Structure formats: structure tokens, C-alpha cells
Amino acid sequence: MTVPVAAAVLAVDVGNAKTDLALVAADGTLIGAVRGPSASHQAVGLERGLDRLVELATQAAAVSGHGPARPAPGDRSALPGPVAQIGAFCLAGADTPGDIRRLARAIGRRGLVADVLVRNDADAALRAGAPDGWGVVLVCGEGFNCLGVHPDGRAIRLPALGEISGDWGGGHGLGMAALAAALRGRDGRGPRTAREAAVPAQFGLHRPLEVTYAIYGGRLAERRLGELAPVVFAIARSGDAVARGIADHLADELAGAAVATIRRLRLVRAAVPVILSGGVFRTEDPEFHVRLRARIAAGVPRARIARLGVPPVVGAALLGLDRLGAPAAAGDRLRLELTEARLTPAS
């Protein structure tokens, strides 16, 4: 596959719910961009995820009018050569050095790009949200992550491997807590809560225990518990004390991660950018946002807290341009061109 406008960077942001992919020229010009289903190796498997990346890369070129016809799913012969000089792949689940090496080797075998750069999706969010490339990012989508980068380049990141690494949060954590509270309220082990009806209703069921049995029996994917995150916040806003407790716990966990990371970077007195990225931060629950910001400010008074205002794939593209030594003007142009509106839904 070739494109007349030379693609310097293939930028990829892979989450557990979606994949954003963009082809970018060396001067920051956007060649094409698409949004498709998740290509996460954790969600769909490594080979299927790579097949999706090939399909999406082909579509990104086709969006610009320069690419070939879309290949059949899994058609690995559709790529006679690299589509870009460098590929910046920012992937959910690229959490350990071993993950990064394994993913880089697998991506390299597909021949999508001449040079492969693999990072975690938190790296993309931080690079997109912090213009100078340093600060802290809290990622709270289906899962949870925290990354901090010092102005000198030193990085601190949480393991982000769930309860086995001391982490709690994300949509899945909220959903699991909501289900547990609904079950305990129903059987008398805990206080009554409006979620006793709302939790099963989300999945077309009637009782909380039906949700448990559906997950246990393989009829309902456990990852779908993340769908309960908006339900938790909605019930919390209605005055349900149990739901409010879960939302407060999430705010405290997120703030604690940010403050601890900033302390480890020895930046407590600095005006540290703290970027909030991920679907959970789109909640309209004001108490959650107030509590989160207050907890961070209590530990880092000069922290500059802001929600990420651009797609994280912008950060992946910037990391690729950084690797190429592109001038700042290229990044400025990219930020203007690579917007949510330019991410064409994959067909």
C-alpha cells in the first residue's frame, strides 16, 4: 500500500473499547484518520488485533483518496510495503517491558512501518495533553493507569495490573463495586441501595444474582461491568449513599495515585500539569470532579488539572514526530488538523 503524500508517522491509540489510527506527514499534515473497534491484544487476541490494525491502516490511506481498496478481513497480503516511516503504537495492555518487546516484535513482523515504537496508551494521553511533554496523566476508562514524567525525562508509572498490583478504578472497578453492593444490599449483608434494580436492568435482567450467574456461566462477559459506570454516577447524583461512597472512593484513588506519583518525581511544589483522560472523566457528576480536584490540590497546591481536550491519538502522532526530530511547527499543525471530527468511522 502506498500513499502519494509521504506518511512519516502511523499513529495508533488502542484502548479496550476502540482504536484510533492516523497517517501523518513529516510537516504535521494529516493524511487520513479512522476510528474502529478495539485492536487490543487483551480484548481480541494478538493476531486478530494486528489484523484490525492492517485493515484500519488501509482505510486511513483510503480516506485521503490515495489508498487501495479495503482488504478483506485478515488479508495480510494487502500491504506490499510500509505505510509510514515510523509507527507509534500506544496500546492498552503494554504495561511491562516484556509486553512492549513482545508487541513490538509482533507488529514488526506485519511490515506496517519501517520503525516500530510501542508505548502504553497513557504515554499518548500525556503527550497529547501536556504541551511540554512532562506532567502526570490519570487514565480512567475501562481500566485505570497513572504515568508521570519529570521535565528531565524521568518517568514514574504505576503497574496498572489491577488488584494484584494494588490498583483499583476504571469503569470495570466501578461496575464490580456496583454489582457487589447490589448483591449485598439484596441479601442483607450491606445497606439497601437503588442499584439492586439498576444493576441487573442494565443487562436486561431482574436481580443482581442473575448478573453474577450470567458472568459465572459465560453468558455475560465480565468486562461488560464497565457499562455500569454511568449508572453508579447517576444513582450517586440522586442521593444514594452507597453509590456516592463508590464514586468518592474512585476520586480518592485517582487523586492518591496522582499525588504519590508527583511526590516520587519530587515536583510537589511545581505547577504540574495533571491530565485527565478516559471515558469515566466525562461523567457529569459534579461532586466527583470537585472531590478529585480538591484531593489533588491538597497534596500538590499548584497542580494544573485539566481534562484532555484532544483525541489521545494526537499524542501518539506527536511521539512519532518527536522520534523523527520534527520541528515544533509540525506538532502545531497536527494539533489543528487531527480532531475528533477528522476520525472517520471504520466501515
Regions found by a protein language model. Name each.
Residues 46, 87-92, 99-100:
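N-terminal functional module of multi-domain proteins
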Residues 94-197, 343-346:
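Phosphate-binding/catalytic loop of phosphoryl-transfer enzymes
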Residues 90, 119, 273-277:
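Solvent-exposed beta-strand sheet faces enriched in polar/charged residues
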Residues 1-68, 75-84, 108-109, 128-134, ...:
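ATP-binding/phosphotransfer module of carbohydrate and carboxylate kinases, centering on a glycine-rich
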Residues 37, 90, 147, 159, ...:
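Residues in well-ordered beta-strands of folded domains
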